[in-house]
Regions:
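A glycine/threonine-rich phosphate-anchoring loop and its flanking beta-alpha core
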Residues: 101-193
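Short glycine/serine/threonine-rich phosphate/pyrophosphate-binding segments
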Residues: 94-101, 122, 238
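ATP/NTP phosphate-donor binding region
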Residues: 1-86
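C-terminal charged capping/lid subdomain of soluble metabolic enzymes
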Residues: 173, 275-349
Length: 349
């Protein structure tokens, strides 16, 4: 069944409508400790949720693991969930990823609705059917493709976010601009993230979601063009896992932004991406995201992490690169020297 994405101007009305189209002998609402405090109050008095069962998990990506997943399964079981129950995931990407995985595996699958509350989840995590958890220090190592019945996007939740979380989600929007068209990219690399115009941002969010929807609809299980969405993610996931391993975790969008620096450099070297556009994009990222401190001694660990990437085939590290804005080159390979050169550029500029 095709996932429906609703850009909502009236959250209660649209949630009631979505619930009415789903089986629901019982309703469970999954939040983490942060969204329970900041976002649950915005919907807790909705009549449709008056008899719901709340499930609250610990916040942050470090808890996106088997232990937390088991807690959710146990809460569903203790709450009397059946195959006809409904779970609503209210939160950022950690909640929608883990909650979607829990729902899609409990009793072989129950319906779920995603209400993303972070910019990152609105434009990326909650749309497209990817669910999962981290395992063995690796990002999203275990998971399944499973569409929520509905994704309800309501930008009122953006006022709960700090600047870092706005920037984190914006990195995925920048990626969507790079794989889309020049007009979208040009608007994104000139947007003032320090003083965001929320009306403009809301319009850009809707456009960004449409970019991802078009790609996912064409290739739901990532056999071809959906790999375009992996721009920045081969290096980005390595940066993210590396930071997690050394006990200094970074937000996913920051990791993707750093990954785009290396992969745009690789695009300029290998697939003729225009150097002026590379430098303009890299300058925007450096000004808004800072950097991740790495040394040459870290390169073997980072490359080892890239070897674990799910996009790889036969032990060869695969990248999504660009020939130009909107000119996507999937299944690109690079040897270790080329990767080290890109890491040098990331580190030294």
């Amino acid at each position: 069944m095709k996932q429906k994405v609703v850009i909502s101007g009236n959250l209660e009305r649209d949630l009631v409508s979505a619930i009415s189209e789903c089986e629901h002998d019982r309703i469970f609402v999954l939040t983490d400790e942060t969204t329970q405090q900041l976002c649950w109050p915005k919907i807790k008095n909705f009549k449709a949720l008056k008899d719901c069962t709340p499930i609250i998990i610990k916040a942050t990506d470090t808890h996106k693991n088997l232990d937390t997943l088991a807690e959710v399964w146990q809460a569903l079981s203790n709450g009397g969930a059946t195959r006809h129950s409904l779970m609503i995931n209210l939160g950022g990407g950690m909640v929608t990823d883990l909650g979607g995985f829990a729902a899609s595996t409990f009793k072989r699958g129950i319906d779920f609705i995603n209400i993303p509350t972070t910019l990152l989840a609105m434009v990326d995590a909650s749309v497209g059917g990817k669910t999962g958890i981290n395992f063995g220090g690796l990002k999203n190592e275990i998971g399944v493709f499973s569409d929520s019945r509905f994704v309800i996007i309501n930008t009122q939740f953006l006022d709960t976010l700090d600047h870092d979380n706005i920037c984190s989600g914006y990195a995925e929007m920048l990626k969507h601009g790079l794989i889309s068209d020049e007009r979208t990219w040009a608007e994104l690399v000139t947007f003032d993230l320090d003083n965001p115009d929320l009306n403009q941002l809301q319009r850009m969010v809707a456009e960004s979601i449409k970019v991802k929807e078009r790609i996912v609809e064409t290739d739901p299980h990532e056999h071809g063009i959906r790999k375009a969405l992996n721009l920045g993610h081969t290096m980005g996931h390595a940066f993210e896992s590396f930071a997690m391993r050394r006990g200094t975790p970074i937000l996913h969008g920051y990791a993707v932004a750093y990954g785009m620096i290396g992969e745009l450099y690789m695009s300029a070297r290998k697939t003729a991406f225009p150097t002026d556009r590379m430098h303009q994009t890299v300058r925007f990222i450096r000004e808004n995201y800072g950097t991740l401190n790495i040394t040459c001694d870290d390169y073997p660990t980072l490359i080892e992490l890239m070897h674990h990437d799910k996009k790889n085939t036969s032990g060869i590290i695969n990248f999504t690169l660009l020939g130009n804005v909107g000119d996507i080159r999937i299944n690109q390979t690079a040897n270790e020297e080329e990767i080290k050169e890109a890491l040098d550029f990331f580190r030294e500029g």
